[in-house]
Regions:
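Conserved glycine-rich beta-strand-loop-beta hairpin in the small C-terminal domain of fold type I
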Residues: 306-320, 332-347
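Conserved core of the PLP fold type I
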Residues: 67-213, 218-240, 244, 415
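Active-site PLP attachment segment
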Residues: 234-274, 283-287, 400-404
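PLP-dependent enzyme catalytic core of the Aspartate aminotransferase-like
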Residues: 83, 87, 91, 95-96, ...
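N-terminal "arm"/small-domain region of PLP-dependent enzymes with the aminotransferase-like
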Residues: 1-76, 87, 91, 213-215, ...
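Amphipathic alpha-helix from the class-I
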Residues: 269-271, 289-311, 325-326
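Conserved C-terminal alpha-helix-loop-beta "cap" of PLP-dependent enzymes
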Residues: 24-28, 342-389, 400-402
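Short, solvent-exposed loop/turn segments at secondary-structure junctions
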Residues: 39-43, 109-110, 138-141, 190-193, ...
Length: 417
């Protein structure tokens, strides 16, 4: 059987496919595996109780149940949801948006597939454009979504070494140079995998840079503000008519509902909705229906701020303390935890590299993610990307502590301690 170039691109191996395969095998074949690799959110009891209550009420109403189960959404997504979300964004964030500025997708992964291919790839006259990533490491799922080669360009970040075996990445604005072949600038805030949060001043500089080059700034807010608000530092919500913000319900504890949200000026939303209709026909109804109920009852933001954020802040603090204890005396550093649900461990000069360390940990029953695939668009050789691991602390706290102890033991063995 001969397969197309499309099949080679999307049917072959990639970092995100390896990640999801590991997660699937861990659940079905190795159920005792300590899961510190994937992006599944933790279980927040207050959130789960609220979701059961609101979903139950929706399904008990015959008209609402039919609207969820028996009809297709419009191409841009459910009108009531988009209007309710726009009202909240105007009231809470001061964004000048209406329902016409919002589109729904079947998860933010599919949203980025459409967005990146709207702004980058092949253009008239044989020209090609790329997405500029000002700060890598970046989300592993970006790496393979382009329909053409060379979809991403990135450069090394600035690295600030901090006390207590911490460090922090920053945008190296001196080396950041969009050009005529740049179709858009994209950042995640907080950043998956590192937990980095770009400051307001950095976002303002990126916004000005994008405007100066006539290209949009895309902000991946899957972990950010205004929801799910997995932030441990101050960060002002940012949007204007040159910004595309992508939000998600997944990290509220709802990854199974596959609901991504695009907030942009109307012409971008219209183009996105047309492309998304061709690819998906329509989006699922359950996520928007549940989110509308939460918005109508004024529950979405209090849930994020009073339950989701404290849950992850506490988990981050405990995991950071445990990991710092394990790496004491080793040439390792942890990225400053400012948000999201991961610790990013830099094992400087680790013998054999982080992929070999990942394999050894997997053999010992701990699933993490090696760092190499989190550097999309970075062409130049850099040993740093083979020295890092992403660790999730979202799952059962005792198992996370046990996993961190095994990681520490394996690191000491690796360094000959």
């Amino acid at each position: 059987m001969e397969l197309s170039l499309f099949a080679r691109r999307f049917g072959g191996d990639s970092g995100v496919i390896d990640l999801m395969r590991d997660l699937g095998e861990a659940v079905s074949i190795h159920p005792d595996m300590i899961m510190m690799g994937g992006g599944n959110p933790g279980r927040v009891p207050a959130a789960e109780r609220l979701y059961r209550k609101r979903l139950g009420a929706l399904l008990d109403d015959p008209a609402l149940a039919h609207a969820i189960l028996g009809v297709y959404q419009s191409p841009r997504g459910d009108e009531r949801f988009r209007a309710a979300l726009a009202r909240m964004l105007r009231a809470e964030c001061g964004w000048e948006v209406g329902a016409q500025n919002i589109a729904v997708a079947n998860g933010s992964q599919s949203a980025f597939f459409v967005l990146f291919n709207l702004f980058a790839g092949e253009f008239d006259g044989g020209r090609c454009k790329h997405i500029l990533l000002p700060l890598v490491p970046e989300y592993i799922g970006y790496r393979e979504v382009g329909l053409s080669d060379g979809m991403f360009h990135a450069g090394r970040p600035a690295i600030e070494r901090l006390p207590e075996q911490l460090f922090k990445y920053g945008v190296d604005f001196e080396r950041l140079a969009p050009d005529a072949a740049t179709g858009a600038i994209c950042v995640s805030r907080p950043t998956n995998p590192t937990g980095n949060v770009l400051g307001d001043a950095e976002i303002a500089r990126l916004d000005a840079l994008a405007r100066a080059h006539g290209i949009p700034l895309i902000i991946d807010g899957a972990y950010g503000t205004p929801f799910p608000h997995m932030l441990f530092t101050d960060a002002t919500p940012h949007w204007n008519d040159n910004t595309v913000v992508v939000l998600s319900l997944s990290k509220l504890g709802l990854p199974g509902l596959r609901t991504g949200i695009v907030v942009a000026r109307e012409e971008i939303v219209a183009a996105f909705a047309r492309a998304n209709t061709i690819l998906s026909l329509a989006c699922g109804n359950t996520g928007p229906a549940l989110a509308t109920a939460l918005l109508d009852h004024g529950e979405l933001l209090p849930l994020a701020r009073e339950h989701i954020a404290p849950f992850y802040r506490d988990r981050a603090t405990r995991a950071l303390d445990a990991l710092r204890h394990e790496i004491a005396g080793l040439p390792c550093r942890i990225h400053k935890a400012e948000g999201a649900m991961f610790l990013w461990l830099w094992c400087e000069g680790i013998p054999g590299g982080s992929h070999a360390l990942y394999q050894r940990l997997k053999q010992r029953g701990v699933l993490v993610v090696p760092g190499r695939d989190f550097f999309p668009g970075l062409i130049e050789p850099w040993e740093h990307r083979d020295e890092c691991l992403r660790l999730s602390y979202a799952q059962d706290e005792e198992r996370v502590r046990a996993g961190i102890a095994i990681i520490g033991d394996e690191l000491r063995r690796s360094y000959g301690g």
